[in-house]
Amino acid sequence: MSMYDVLIIGAGPGGIFTAYELIERRPDLKIAIFEHGHELSRRKCPIDGEKIKSCIHCNCCSIMSGFGGAGAFSDGKYNITNDFGGTLYEYIGKKNAIELMEYVDKINLKFGGEGTKLYSTAGTKFKKTCMQHGLHLLD
């Protein structure tokens, strides 16, 4: 039987970053990550919009469970701001919250995000239309 120093339950962002931080600080640790969900290549949601139009409550949800959690199917955009999207700053202060967001962004870039095209709505008709309807967009 294999012995591990650390067992991490869940391979969502929290579990993945926990493993990363532990390895950075203690490369000697033997770490195992346990995940309920399917591997990425087997994560398929049965909702097709025709026969199945809404959630059928699968035993293991392929959207929420599996490596990367729900973020595995996102477009990968991060909002590096305290203006919306969460309230971490209420616990650690605005400056520290931004520093942590930038730290996470640097790690993501290190593992394949470098060359990602930046997207901005600044000065666009889309942004103007959104603002007219009370929607706030990050530039």
Label the predicted regions.
Residues P13-I16, E39:
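Generic N-terminal leader segments that precede the first folded domain
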